[in-house]
């Protein structure tokens, strides 16, 4: 089995080393194509306005000056010699990719790009108690459980238009309680903040920050599982259509385009 590895934390990230150790439990036919620089939060961004440069580290390991999506596309169309991969693994991300964060995640995007090429793709993330708290990161949890989970997923299979999003809880392996197949959750509080700073010349600048807030996610969600020490396995697909709203709106917007009648209309609550 040929496996392509990528990530969004960059070619030197410790999580990529963990991913390689997971992959080599499954196969010795491994290709690694990862960003030269960190691309956390890049989502499905493409490099369109600059050339994409590639550094070959060894015959099957490349660093790409681009996003995770660029990396997978480059691997598929320019870098991998011989047969296409049978599997794309993206990660292991430094921090969880849960709930609405999956739309921001370069790790998830790498898996989506693999799926777009018709390859079975899995995103893997290691949750942390605090953002980028690598001192106490439990990489051993992902490495301990990752091979078995990937193997079982391959045995079970999943639809071609679906990726699998795996999140390991921020605990040591012996503290993991079980694996749960979950749905994508949604946080009940906003956790990002834009923090204002001032440089030595008196000019303002801003950092994106994260605020730890109490949360009570719904049962059956990826959030709840990881918060309670379980490994979350979530099938995701790229179709973002909300079918219930489609059905509800058809009566109001179907047919002849509506005409603007008067200003100041109140919106529906």
Curated annotation (Swiss-Prot):
Entry keyword Nucleotide-binding: yes
Q: Which domain of life is it from?
A: Bacteria
According to the record, how does the cofactor bind? Binds 1 divalent metal cation per subunit.
- For the keyword Hydrolase, the answer is yes
Q: What is its EC number?
A: 3.1.3.5
* InterPro entries, per database record: SurE (IPR030048), SurE-like_Pase/nucleotidase (IPR002828), SurE-like_sf (IPR036523)
- Disulfide connectivity for this sequence is none
Q: What class of enzyme is it?
A: hydrolase
**Which reactions does this protein catalyse?**
a ribonucleoside 5'-phosphate + H2O = a ribonucleoside + phosphate
Checking SUPFAM superfamilies in the record gives: SurE-like (SSF64167)
Where's it found, cell-wise? Cytoplasm
Q: One GO molecular-function annotation for this sequence?
A: 5'-nucleotidase activity
Any idea which positions bind a divalent metal cation?
Answer: 8-9, 40, 93
Q: Which family does it belong to?
A: Belongs to the SurE nucleotidase family.
HAMAP family (UniProt xref): SurE
UniProt protein name:
5'-nucleotidase SurE
Tell me which species this is from: Caulobacter sp. (strain K31)
């Amino acid at each position: 089995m040929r496996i392509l590895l990528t990530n969004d934390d960059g070619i030197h990230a410790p999580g990529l080393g963990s991913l390689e150790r997971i992959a080599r439990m499954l196969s010795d036919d491994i290709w690694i194509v990862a960003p030269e620089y960190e691309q956390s939060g890049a989502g499905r961004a493409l490099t369109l306005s600059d050339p994409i440069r590639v550094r070959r580290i060894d015959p099957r390991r490349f660093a790409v000056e681009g996003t995770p999506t660029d990396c997978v596309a480059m691997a598929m169309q320019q870098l991998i010699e011989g047969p296409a991969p049978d599997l794309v693994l993206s990660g292991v991300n430094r921090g969880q990719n849960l709930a609405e964060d999956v739309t921001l995640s370069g790790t998830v995007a790498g898996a989506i790009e693999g799926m777009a090429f018709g390859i079975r793709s899995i995103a893997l993330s290691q949750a942390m108690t605090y953002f980028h708290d690598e001192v106490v990161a439990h990489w051993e949890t992902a490495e301990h459980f990752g091979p078995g989970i990937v193997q079982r997923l391959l045995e079970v299979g999943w639809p071609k238009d679906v990726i699998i999003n795996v999140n390991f809880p921020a605990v040591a392996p012996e503290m993991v309680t079980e694996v749960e197949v979950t749905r994508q959750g949604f946080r009940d509080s906003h956790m990002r903040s834009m923090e204002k700073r001032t440089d030595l010349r008196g000019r303002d600048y801003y950092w994106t920050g994260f605020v730890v807030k109490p949360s009570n996610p719904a049962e059956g969600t990826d959030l709840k599982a990881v918060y309670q020490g379980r490994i979350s396995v979530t099938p995701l697909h790229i179709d973002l259509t909300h079918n219930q709203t489609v059905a509800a709106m058809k009566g109001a917007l179907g047919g002849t385009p509506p005409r603007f009648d008067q200003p100041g209309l109140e919106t529906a609550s």
